[in-house]
């Protein structure tokens, strides 16, 4: 549960500016909890939230009342289910933005984080992104580099893992 919360916080922090311009968010949650009619089957819940543009314009801070309500609903849904699918439609403000409609979809699975990697030199393995440095640095300097890139150091414990990552 703590791991799920950490991933949800990361998603929220990265999308705070997007949420402040959001007019519609839809969530789909797949739950492994047993239902009364189909024991053991997956149940699908859909939650759709429409936020009027006027109510969002009242708040300048992305962590304001509206965003907090949206985040709280997302957090509750994420904790209750296994997979969260979010469909986010944002409001365009500049004339150039209005020419191109924006529809964003985010797929999130708490067992493995599915996302596109930050740059081409990162490797994807089992839904997670890895970057292997070309130069050797101390542990502390490497940790600082990871913190700057919002990532963590990978610890390789056996030769099999090294082969998988072509090290």
UniProtKB/Swiss-Prot annotation:
GO terms for cellular component: plasma membrane. May function in mediating immune cell-cell interactions. May act as a T-cell costimulatory molecule, enhancing anti-CD3-induced proliferation. May play a role in the interaction of dendritic cells with T-cells and the cells of the adaptive immune response. Glycans are attached at residues 109, 140, 149. Disulfide bonds: none annotated. It comes from Homo sapiens (Human). The gene is CLECL1P. This is Putative C-type lectin-like domain family 1. Keywords: Cell membrane, Glycoprotein, Lectin, Membrane, Signal-anchor, Transmembrane, Transmembrane helix. One of its GO terms (molecular function) is carbohydrate binding.
